[in-house]
Amino acid sequence: HSKSFLLKHWALGLPDLHLLLLAPVSQNDLVGIVGGHSAPQGRWPWQISLRVYSYRWAAWVHICGGSLIHPQWVLTAAHCIGRKDADPSAYRVQAGNVFLYGDTKLLHVNRVIVHPDYVNAFLGSDVALLRLAKPAVCSANIKPVRLSSLSDSITPRDQCWVTGWGAISMFGSLPPPFRLQQVEVQVVKNAVCEQQYHNASRHRHRDRRIILDDMLCAGSEGRSACYGDSGGPLVCKVTGSWRLVGVVSWGIGCALRNIPGVYARVQSFVPWIQQQMRRYT
């Protein structure tokens, strides 16, 4: 994780990197998904774990989160996949279990579609679709989430949650039994988020935008998504039902003061997602 953490800081040109990396973090301040709690079974039935095979562990290991958006389709972050010509057989999906390694029946993937405009997370378009070889059997614990529609207006007043199995602080990973974590976060307006990131980078990027239109910010001090949660869902309650509003994309550290996490804004990609699903379902 330290490598990706360094890369994140380098890309943003942040000062005093060594201070951020070595700053002591009290485990009392950062628990769960960073300020979160264990998730009840079935509360977030669209949450999936994306796996790749590790020869070191001789097992399919968790690399990212994702969301079931149709019985046969998963939405995750493009940076979880990386290559546009990724081999679908290199991936597996676990659905329907809050325990990360509690289920031996993993789902196969037979198509991977990385957004054509994706270069890296900082430049946006950080979304990818995975088509499952067979549709997931829906149940109380496995259910697709509705996509945020273009007409939804998401504000800081909305009830929003982020979930995942990632690190619980900048310096520690989730301990066994690897139970799904949940945390309530607040959406931050893009203009406010932009200012916060410019302040964090000491205005080294004043000539360019950091938070693009296809991004969305959320978090609050001590509560945030962290490394292993990439690709996972940010959902908000819109007119009484949960909508997938964001895909965990990038950020500086974890749950730092006045620095929200950055998500791919699902609304921006709905036409593309629907087009791909129609084309390949």
Region annotations inferred by a language model:
Residues Y55, W73-V74, C80-I81, V98-L100, ...:
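Conserved beta-strand elements of beta-rich interaction domains across eukaryotes
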Residues W46-R51, V74-T76, A128-R131, D158-G164, ...:
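A structural motif
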Residues Q47-A59, L174-T281:
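Extracellular trypsin-like serine protease catalytic domains
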Residues Q27, L50-Y53, V74-A77, G82-N120, ...:
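Conserved H-D interstitial segment of serine endopeptidase catalytic domains
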Residues V74-A78, G124-S149, T281:
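Conserved active-site neighborhood of the chymotrypsin/trypsin-like protease fold
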Residues D117-V119, P135-Q186:
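Active-site substrate-binding loop(s) of clan PA
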Residues G35-G42, Y118-F122, R206-R208, A225:
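Conserved, non-catalytic sequence blocks in retroelement Pol enzymes and Pol-derived host proteins
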Residues H1-L75, R92, D214:
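Protease-domain processing segments flanking chymotrypsin-fold serine proteases, especially trypsin-like
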